[in-house]
Curated annotation (Swiss-Prot):
Entry similarity comment: Belongs to the glutamyl-tRNA reductase family.
Source species: Nitratidesulfovibrio vulgaris (strain DP4) (Desulfovibrio vulgaris)
PROSITE patterns in the cross-refs: GLUTR (PS00747)
Oligomer status and interactors: Homodimer.
Any single GO BP term: protoporphyrinogen IX biosynthetic process from glutamate
Protein name: Glutamyl-tRNA reductase
NCBIfam families: hemA (TIGR01035)
Active site per UniProt: 51
Function recorded in the entry: Catalyzes the NADPH-dependent reduction of glutamyl-tRNA(Glu) to glutamate 1-semialdehyde (GSA).
Record keywords: NADP, Oxidoreductase, Porphyrin biosynthesis
Length: 440
């Protein structure tokens, strides 16, 4: 059975944020725990886990690949496979390649054209390489995905008017507060999303930016870039009272802000409104916070309306990008099919060469001693004959194998026609048998 490419995943279209956080694999713990082992069934694996999607790429043999990935994924999160299954999509072969190229090109993102997904995919690939979980197929596929993403960004305008999740968060804040110059914002986390949010907040005219991060030095570095103030993480709840707008984007595995924490903050603020935007998955802020008076909590799924308004501007460019994706998907499919054909070509050439060498040895034995020049001439003649005899069948196989549906059938015919799978009968045995029949 031939190896195939499988993509198993869920995203912002198939699962809400509460489901995505239950099944998030932000630390690639599936690989670390070895619950998708590299063996005869699964030979390569890569995990992409972001706030909007979890996708597992696997190369393997047979339908057991999907069930094994689902079991491992659910087990890694301490969940039941049946709870995961309703939210999952599965792509195989050509469809898996197309989907990955769409993802890498940000055509499948909540924010079409956003640049973060490509960096996240590259990071996932780096981690898979570090754990020795990729081989020739995924290596080729991921490099091709990066190339496709580059083509889309350079040959279309799909990214020219793109917004980021951070931009959408700030736009939502502007709709609530209007003029921003009399309000203060706090960023919890100091990663790429926080940096983008700081950029958009500053552009919107925010009066002050605070940055709270577990690693104080990183928080101070980000605050310095935007003329803000860094806060020690242990002082978070004391300083929350200073902020009107809080945007949280940490990589915590559970909520870091709960309703009981905010009650005291509200008292110290004399119950002035607080606006929380949680763009982390898993979520940083307990949903119960939204039940408090004068507190307004939004999560990443609430940003879709802002994103949809921006989407209309990019639909035409996205259509051009999809044409590129289709073209490159076809090219990769041809390469993958050529990979399937290669063992048959190698076996055919090796069999022909073995027969030629056996015949040469038999001929030299009959001739007796010959000089080196004669021997070289005989070897050159046989080598030329092998190449010329194999040229037509190999060319025919390559041409027919490019036909997606017919390719495997022609491989099977060729292997049977040239007896390439008969391991028990040496290639010269048939010649000896035929010669024996002719002599009698």
């Amino acid at each position: 059975m031939e190896r195939d490419i499988y993509l198993i995943g869920l995203n912002h279209r198939t699962a809400g944020v509460e489901v995505r956080e239950r099944f998030a694999l932000t630390d690639c713990n599936v690989l670390e725990q070895g619950v998708v082992p590299i063996d005869d069934v699964v030979s390569e694996v890569l995990i992409l886990s972001t706030c909007n999607r979890v996708e597992i790429l696997a190369v393997g043999r047979g339908p057991e690949v999907v069930s094994r990935v689902l079991r491992g994924w659910a087990a890694a999160r301490g969940q039941c496979e049946h709870d995961l299954a309703p939210y999952v999509y599965t792509h195989k072969g050509h469809e898996a390649v197309r989907h990955l190229f769409r993802v890498a090109s940000s055509l499948d993102s909540m924010v079409v054209g956003e640049p973060q997904i490509l960096g996240q995919l590259k990071d996932a690939y780096r981690k898979a390489i570090e754990r020795n979980c990729t081989r020739v197929i995924l290596n080729r596929l991921l490099h091709k995905a990066f190339s496709v993403a580059k083509r889309v960004r350079t040959e279309t305008g799909v990214a020219s008017s793109a917004v980021s999740i951070s931009y959408a968060a700030v736009e939502l804040a502007k709709r609530i507060f209007g003029e921003m110059n009399q309000y203060k914002a706090m960023l919890i986390g100091a990663g790429e999303m926080a940096e983008l949010a700081a950029t958009h907040l500053l552009h919107a005219g925010i009066s002050k930016i605070y940055v709270a991060n577990r690693t104080f030095e990183r928080g101070r570095e980000l605050a310095r870039q935007f003329n803000g103030e860094a806060i020690h993480f242990e002082d978070l709840f004391e300083r929350l009272a200073d902020a009107d707008i809080i945007i949280s984007s940490t990589g915590a595995h559970e909520a870091i802000i709960r309703a009981r924490d905010i009650k005291d903050v509200l008292r110290r603020r004399k119950h002035r409104p607080m606006f929380f935007i949680d763009i982390a998955v898993p979520r940083d802020i307990d949903p119960d916070v939204n039940n408090l008076d004068n507190v307004y909590l939004y999560d990443i799924d609430d940003l879709k309306e802002v994103v949809e308004e921006n989407l209309a501007q990019r639909r035409e460019e996205a259509s051009k990008a999809l044409t590129i994706v289709e073209e490159e998907t076809g090219k990769f499919g041809q390469w993958l099919r050529s990979l399937e054909l290669q063992p048959t070509i190698v076996d055919l050439i090796r069999r022909s060469e073995r027969i030629a060498q056996d015949e040469l040895a038999r001929t030299l034995k009959r001739l007796g001693p010959v000089d080196d020049e004669t021997r070289d001439a005989l070897e050159a003649m046989l080598s030329s004959m092998v190449r010329k005899l194999n040229h037509e069948p190999i060319t025919f196989l390559k041409r027919r194998h490019s036909e997606e549906d017919a390719g495997p059938r022609y491989i099977d015919i060729a292997r049977r026609m040239f007896n390439l799978d008969d391991d028990n009968v040496p290639p010269d045995a048939h010649c000896d048998r035929r010669r024996h029949d002719e002599d009698n």
